[in-house]
């Protein structure tokens, strides 16, 4: 690898950060943006005119990998230097570098603290040896509470002091557990100006789901301390963020490595109390770890969306066992019933895999039964495919590609129908809509049961009898509305009154 002092970037050089995949990657890109900005780079999300393009890749499933490759190739056609970072780069390392000569460098997560020097080396024409991938779970202690002591790069876990490399401008800042949140340094630079932002609770995963390769390249589960999260939440609020979306590989596990397996229940009201934040949304919940206290905290805490992003993956017990997961149709329905007993209008979404090795017609029928009874607001259906290095890739009982596609098409159509029906059940109900955008008079936002990008949206229309002035609404406004129509999973609603106006907006 190139040493940290092999190149020094010049002020004003333009770098584009292109982000693929999940919201966790978006947070990682904003950490990279902060590190680069601290060294004088002009950071953009538009590749036009950039001297170097960094593609923060996704390596989750085959389609995501193909999207990453296509983005890297398209970036190379602009004439800019191209650098692959992110999950696919971490997962394949030297193999990716050898197969993709269009990329001048393939970086590991371990390169992130020195990203400025790495890009400087690329522009100087210095070759950077790609890493040999390794199982990042083995880099951290088996005992969860000792993991934060390990010197391992964890994207999204940086501090401002860490941003100062050999050529950096940021002075180290000493903090301890007594430092107030508003005085803690934050290593992040927003690449989006919208009223919603993700807040990364943790990285990695300790589960061993047979189909998933993520723990091997993201590592074991490591939580961020509450005080660090509160500092970042306050900083995000000062930039205009109104909704925080809590992300990780498994948010239900938050705090177990901090000695407090109930830490998320305590953190939620603290985040909701941050000045300027009107909604906190938890995501990536594991059903087996979604305990009654966590259900209650999400369902009843003021300022926290009654929204349950539950990773069911299937509902047939035999399939779940082969996946190395836990649960059944009845257990999952009981969990949803406990949610709705506390918050009848709570939102619920999940993803499901069809065609997993050994899946039978009876298993599919059981999944169909669950979907028909679950009343989920949003359903994602994925067709199974073997992933390198996973246990499932070596399982017997593979389902033919033709059968997988048939089941995928059937379940996808059912999901669309059921989610549209669930949306219709909200007709006449009152929802709180956070305005995301106002474009040519079209006001669009999301109700509490709608997460950004994946769960549909709510379009606001002018009330017939006066009331809220639609033309006066701005991104970041939180508005009480009545649902008047639906379009698939999307809602149409009339604003009844302002709950909380976005601060600092001229009206």
Curated annotation (Swiss-Prot):
Residues 155-172 have a biased composition (Low complexity). [4Fe-4S] cluster 2 binds at residues 205, 209, 212. The lineage of its organism: Bacteria, Bacillati, Actinomycetota, Actinomycetes, Micromonosporales. Keywords: 4Fe-4S, Cytoplasm, Iron, Iron-sulfur, Metal-binding, S-adenosyl-L-methionine, Transferase. [4Fe-4S] cluster 1 binds at residues 22, 58, 87. This is Ribosomal protein uS12 methylthiotransferase RimO. It comes from the Bacteria. Its EC number is 2.8.4.4. PANTHER family: RIBOSOMAL PROTEIN S12 METHYLTHIOTRANSFERASE RIMO, RIBOSOMAL PROTEIN US12 METHYLTHIOTRANSFERASE RIMO. The gene is rimO.
């Amino acid at each position: 690898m190139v040493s940290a002092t092999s190149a020094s970037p010049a002020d004003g050089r333009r770098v584009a950060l292109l982000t693929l995949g999940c919201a966790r990657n978006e947070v990682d890109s904003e950490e990279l943006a902060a590190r680069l900005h601290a060294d004088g780079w002009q950071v953009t999300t538009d590749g036009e005119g950039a001297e170097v393009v960094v593609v923060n890749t996704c390596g989750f499933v085959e389609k995501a990998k193909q999207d990453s490759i296509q983005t890297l190739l398209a970036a190379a056609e602009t004439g800019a230097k191209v650098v692959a970072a992110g999950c696919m780069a971490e997962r394949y390392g030297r193999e990716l570098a050898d197969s993709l000569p269009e990329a001048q460098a393939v970086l590991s997560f371990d390169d992130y603290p020195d990203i400025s020097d790495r890009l400087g080396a690329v522009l100087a024409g210095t070759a950077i040896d790609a890493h040999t991938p390794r199982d990042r779970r083995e880099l951290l202690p088996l005992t969860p509470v000792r993991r934060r002591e390990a010197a391992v790069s964890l994207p999204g876990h940086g501090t401002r002091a860490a941003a100062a490399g050999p050529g950096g401008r940021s002075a180290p800042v000493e903090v301890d557990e007594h430092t107030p949140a508003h005085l803690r340094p934050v290593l992040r630079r927003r690449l989006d100006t919208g009223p919603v932002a993700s807040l990364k609770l943790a990285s990695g995963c300790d589960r061993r789901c047979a189909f998933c390769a993520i723990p091997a390249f993201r590592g074991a589960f490591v939580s961020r301390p509450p005080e660090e999260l509160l500092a970042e939440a306050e900083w995000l609020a000062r930039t205009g963020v109104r909704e925080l979306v809590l992300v990780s590989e498994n948010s239900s596990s938050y705090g177990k490595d901090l000695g407090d397996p109930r830490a998320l229940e305590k953190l939620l009201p603290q985040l909701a109390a941050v000045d300027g934040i009107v909604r906190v949304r938890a995501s990536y919940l594991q059903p087996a770890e979604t305990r009654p206290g966590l259900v209650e905290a999400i369902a009843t805490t003021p300022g926290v969306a009654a929204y349950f992003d539950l990773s069911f993956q299937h509902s047939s017990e035999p399939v779940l066992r082969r996946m190395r997961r836990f649960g059944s149709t009845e257990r999952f329905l009981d969990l949803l019933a406990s949610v709705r007993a506390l918050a009848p209008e709570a939102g619920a979404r999940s993803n499901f895999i069809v065609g997993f090795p050994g899946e039978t017609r009876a298993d599919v029928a059981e999944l169909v039964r669950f979907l028909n009874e679950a009343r989920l607001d949003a359903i994602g259906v994925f067709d199974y495919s073997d992933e390198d290095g996973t246990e499932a890739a070596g399982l017997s009982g593979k389902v033919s590609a033709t059968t997988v596609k048939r089941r995928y098409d059937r379940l996808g159509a059912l999901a669309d129908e059921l989610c549209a029906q669930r949306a219709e059940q909200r007709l006449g109900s009152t929802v709180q809509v956070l305005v995301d955008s106002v474009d040519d008079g079209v006001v669009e936002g999301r109700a509490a049961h709608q997460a950004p990008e994946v769960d549909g949206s709510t379009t606001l229309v002018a009330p017939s009898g006066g009331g809220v002035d639609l033309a006066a609404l701005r991104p970041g406004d939180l508005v009480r509305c009545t649902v008047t129509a639906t379009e698939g999973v999307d809602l149409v609603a009339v604003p009844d009154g302002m709950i909380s106006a976005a601060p600092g907006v001229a009206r």
